[in-house]
Design a protein with these regions (language model features):
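Compositionally biased terminal segments of proteins
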Residues: 1-215
Length: 215
């Protein structure tokens, strides 16, 4: 599969056939890279969301771990909460998270065997929402890459607002997107073979250009 780092590529098909991933959708940079191939991605981040108000978010980490053990060596397990667990399998980080929010992904995209991925717009919206809590250059680069496909920045902002339950405000999202100084390129980023050689200033300018266009 294109868009995967070599060590992730080695286990990807084995992960895709697991039963335990069926309730989940692959999100984040890897789901994006599989679709637009603008850089390699390493981590496999799986999410599911609540479907009713009475539902209690939780992850069946024990059965997930048992299935992962059938395809390789688990180097570590980090049980962050009952709704979130992270594994390192054969050098690849896999996370499983059951979100208390409702899903922003209207139509998951079948990818390989049991593995489904989020659509590009939803990935962009989720990245905007998570950028309120972290300042990873990869997220900023991914927003730029999505915009280069022609997807509207205003459409992603709208989805991000809905996803947050409208706790986020448009002005907060735009303040972060137009402040490239918050994002510092990490040393390992170039190892991911990005196709765009851009600085934070380049990305900031392009985002402002996109924002200046009509909604």
């Amino acid at each position: 599969m294109k868009g995967l780092a070599p060590h992730t590529q080695r286990i990807f098909e084995s992960v895709a056939v697991l039963e335990c991933i069926k309730p989940y959708i692959l999100v984040g940079g890897t789901a994006l890279s599989l679709q637009i191939c603008t850089r390699q991605s390493e981590d496999l981040d799986f999410m599911k969301w609540r479907t009713s108000k009475d539902e209690s978010p939780e992850v069946d980490w024990y059965h997930i771990e048992k299935e992962l053990e059938t395809i390789g060596e688990i180097q570590s397990r980090n049980l962050l909460d009952m709704d979130h667990v992270e594994f390192v399998l054969e050098g690849v980080k896999l996370s499983f998270y059951s979100s208390p929010k409702y899903s922003p992904v209207k139509e998951p995209i079948p990818c390989l065997y049991n593995l489904r991925i989020a659509d590009i717009r939803s990935i962009g919206a989720m990245k905007m929402e998570v950028m309120m809590r972290r300042s990873n250059f990869r997220d900023y680069y991914d927003i730029y890459s999505i915009l280069k496909t022609g997807i509207s920045i205003w459409e992603m902002v709208s989805i991000a607002l809905d996803y947050s339950g409208h706790r986020l405000k448009t002005k907060n999202i735009l303040a972060i997107l137009t402040n490239g100084a918050r994002f510092r390129r990490d040393e390992r980023f170039n190892q991911l073979s990005p196709i765009y050689q851009v600085t934070t200033e380049d990305i900031e300018c392009y985002i402002k250009e996109c924002l200046s266009q009509s909604k």
